[in-house]
């Protein structure tokens, strides 16, 4: 839910263990995978153009940071089960902002300048790595610098002879209260997949269920001297009071089931439907060594946000049917035809067809 392929990639410098590395001395029972990265957002022009003619906030020249660590327990040579778990986090920070709003409960609201240059020094890079510091419009209610968010992951795999299965879960969080167990983890992504023995009909089945409707509840209040109790709620996934939305060039950087700001009609760089429930189904097969196919279907309902709820939930139904042909006569060549459609009220209804040709390998020269 935190990072995916929905948005344009961010240029970044990345230090990574891309594959699991076995920890010496564990007899292949423990392995780790990790990365750390820093990058630079490249959507300055898009943000200015999208908000042009409005008083909506936008930013430019902000930085990106991500990090992750995963531990895998299991030795498939000795036992068919492996358990993988880990933490993934990311942050948008620094840059410059225009039309930024102050906190409505900040006593210095009258003197707040909506044009702000955020901190871009070494300390900000450290605050992104170890969440700390505060934002320019936090006022007296100091929080964490930048748009910090993350996900906990857990996956159990069964490695059978000629077949396999997996179940997995992901918990997304926007703050400390959901990073740990201050409130129950009601919002989750659950999934399962089965890889079948070799046959000409069906090779893989996938099911996933996503829920983001709780968000720690509908009430939020920072403690004050007169009312010292903190109430952590209204997490409003993918939203941030400085950077607007967890997006790059208009597209959500996590799951596209929380609609991207690009679809907003009023020029707001913000998620307008962060409370959703969705079911996803997928099948894949290889009728022959040259032909493959896949079918994906997703149904979702969206309730808007706690601050701007929908009276009736909007619905979306999405279908993709795709077939590929890779002839043996030309190794590396693949021809793909796809049909997709969007139905329901969440997005405009649409249908489309795509034909693609790809080649992987060296082109021989005479």
How does the language model describe each region?
Residues 80-85, 92-225:
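Long, internal scaffold/assembly segments composed of regular secondary structure
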Residues 20-34, 72-84, 158-164, 196-202, ...:
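Short loop/turn motifs that connect adjacent beta-strands in outer-membrane beta-barrel proteins
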Residues 1-103:
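Internal, well-ordered domain-core segments that constitute the primary functional module
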Residues 216-305:
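C-terminal structural cap/anchor segments
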Residues 19, 38-44, 87-93, 160, ...:
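Transmembrane beta-strands of outer-membrane beta-barrel pores
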Residues 146-147, 173-182, 272-276, 289, ...:
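Solvent-exposed loop/turn segments connecting transmembrane beta-strands
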Residues 12, 349-366:
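Outer-membrane beta-barrel "beta-signal"
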Residues 34-36, 83-87, 165-169, 205-207, ...:
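Membrane-embedded beta-strand positions of outer-membrane beta-barrel proteins
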């Amino acid at each position: 839910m935190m990072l995916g392929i929905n948005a344009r990639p961010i240029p970044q410098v990345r230090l990574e263990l891309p594959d699991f590395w076995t920890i010496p001395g564990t007899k292949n029972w423990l392995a780790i995978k990790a990365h750390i990265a820093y990058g630079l957002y490249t959507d300055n022009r898009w943000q200015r153009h999208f908000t042009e003619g409005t008083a909506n906030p936008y930013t430019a020249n902000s930085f990106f940071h991500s990090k992750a660590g995963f531990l895998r327990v299991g030795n498939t040579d000795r036992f068919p089960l492996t358990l993988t778990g880990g933490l993934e986090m990311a942050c948008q920070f620094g840059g410059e902002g225009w039309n930024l709003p102050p906190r409505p409960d900040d006593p210095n609201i009258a003197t707040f300048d909506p044009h702000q240059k955020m901190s871009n020094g070494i300390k900000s890079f450290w605050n992104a790595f170890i969440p700390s510091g505060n934002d320019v419009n936090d006022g007296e209610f100091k929080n964490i610098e930048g748009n910090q968010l993350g996900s906990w992951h857990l996956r159990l795999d069964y490695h059978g002879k000629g077949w396999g299965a997996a179940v997995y879960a992901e918990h997304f969080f926007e703050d400390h209260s959901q990073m740990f167990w201050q409130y129950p983890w009601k919002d989750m992504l659950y999934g399962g997949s089965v890889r079948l023995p070799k046959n000409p009909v069906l090779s893989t089945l996938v099911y996933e269920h996503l829920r983001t409707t709780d968000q720690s509840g509908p009430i939020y209040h920072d403690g004050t001297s007169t009312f010292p109790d903190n109430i952590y709620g209204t997490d409003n996934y993918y939203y941030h009071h400085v950077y607007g939305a967890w997006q790059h060039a208009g597209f959500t950087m996590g799951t596209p089931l929380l609609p991207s700001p690009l679809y907003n009609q009023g020029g707001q760089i913000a998620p307008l439907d962060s409370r959703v429930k969705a079911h996803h189904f997928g099948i894949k097969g290889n009728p022959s060594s040259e032909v493959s196919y896949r079918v994906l279907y997703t149904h979702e309902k969206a309730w808007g946000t706690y601050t701007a709820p929908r009276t009736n939930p909007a619905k979306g139904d999405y279908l993709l049917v795709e077939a590929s042909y890779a002839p043996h006569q030309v190794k590396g060549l693949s021809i793909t035809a796809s049909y997709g459609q969007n139905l329901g009220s969440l997005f405009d209804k649409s249908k489309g067809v795509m034909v693609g040709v790809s080649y992987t390998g060296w082109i021989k020269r005479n």
